[in-house]
């Protein structure tokens, strides 16, 4: 009988392959080992994502235009796809790629690069562009003297660091010697007209400089090129779902108000995957609209024209304009209309204006300082209403013709009055069974379950960040996946805030969830958060990482996600004996190989 190698159960390799692997391991540093681990895991899990390019002889000397989409909520991706199609119609060879999949170390070989990028959090790049951002800002970034580029930034002027990610990339490209095709454009939430002009000017600039870069053609790297998906329903053309269930799932004594909402899509051709988000068009509360109009002495029946449609001012405020979030620009304009000394003093001091913006909803400002405005003056103050995105908390394989979302109601208690968020207030308070809701799917290919169903996963969440992991477990259960599953979840109280408790207990009983660690911050004197539970399980988490586990984080970007990342860096540093810089490189390698994925907001 042949003697069995003791490694056979673990390594499906020949003796020669195993010896070569052991020799390679002997010569590798910790960083190199981490990179190889991620590299081979990516090879095992990747599928073809190639767009076929066909060029005729006359096109072979044309420069390739690389369009990079760096999106947080889908707007940058949408505009990138439009630019790709626009270039194709104008006989330009282009490729479209997500920032997450871009091989940024090859940027030195690019001739023309267009970056369309949003900004999240405190002036940070979107999640899928973090690795690209860190590389281009590092000392390892190459000389870009041969690069022609343009940056289109997407943001919101109500935030201090407006379009900061785009500004950072633009500045760095210039520092590295890049040649700007067109001045960077920083677009506010109403970007349509600006984008149209920018894309036309960009094409003209590319054509005018064609002789300069046509002699040297950049290589079209087909691997990871983004395949354009066709979805019948979009932000501009939403579907109409039907509310099946709208149920509060936090306890009566909870400080949080969280709703589980189920939507019927049986008559719609909608497909989605775990990790995707649901876009929701909401309506402003009718009482809020009436109060604003009354305080400003505007008749609710007055009509205005919006995009060639004549509608009442009431309809306009309820369906087309943002009424819950105040902004610095609104406050400044309102102060100038009112001539109110208090407001004038507020806008003359940056710190006071910042605090007033945060703590004073639009309706409170109008209530405290009413004046008479015309309908057109009011509309000129306001920002357009935009849809809100919610992580989908269901798997279509499991529940078929439904979509579930988990909505945390935004509440502010100011001067004894509770102010609700526009979208969350609408979803939780206004919608009942059989009501119509306008929706669309926002795909998120950067937050997907592993293709290999044997891959272990670690899910880290707090609050409503648990939503996509409910979808993940439904999918894993439906697939009979053998991969281990570890859930970390944090919220204030066990009895009041354990979202979907019965379902998690069912999965534990079935053996689908291997480990579950819970953090209840207010159930004991010393507050315990999810990052504390992570540190408590340092050695086992490291063991899972060595086994090829993929790590998912969903929750608050400014606090929870940052604290979790610090905890993960501590685990890497301790178990791999790396310093902080090496640990950051290790974690970045996990991100690059799609083993560390975040959906934060």
Swiss-Prot record:
Function: Component of the sulfite reductase complex that catalyzes the 6-electron reduction of sulfite to sulfide. This is one of several activities required for the biosynthesis of L-cysteine from sulfate. The flavoprotein component catalyzes the electron flow from NADPH -> FAD -> FMN to the hemoprotein component.
Gene assigned in the entry: cysJ
Species of provenance: Buchnera aphidicola subsp. Acyrthosiphon pisum (strain APS)
Keyword match Coiled coil: no
Pfam family, one: FAD_binding_1
Enzyme class: oxidoreductase
Name of the protein in question: Sulfite reductase [NADPH] flavoprotein alpha-component
GO biological process: cysteine biosynthetic process; hydrogen sulfide biosynthetic process; sulfate assimilation
Domain of life: Bacteria
Family: Belongs to the NADPH-dependent sulphite reductase flavoprotein subunit CysJ family.
Catalytic activity: hydrogen sulfide + 3 NADP(+) + 3 H2O = sulfite + 3 NADPH + 4 H(+)
Organism taxonomic ancestry: Bacteria, Pseudomonadati, Pseudomonadota, Gammaproteobacteria, Enterobacterales
Required cofactor(s): FAD; FMN
E.C. designation(s): 1.8.1.2
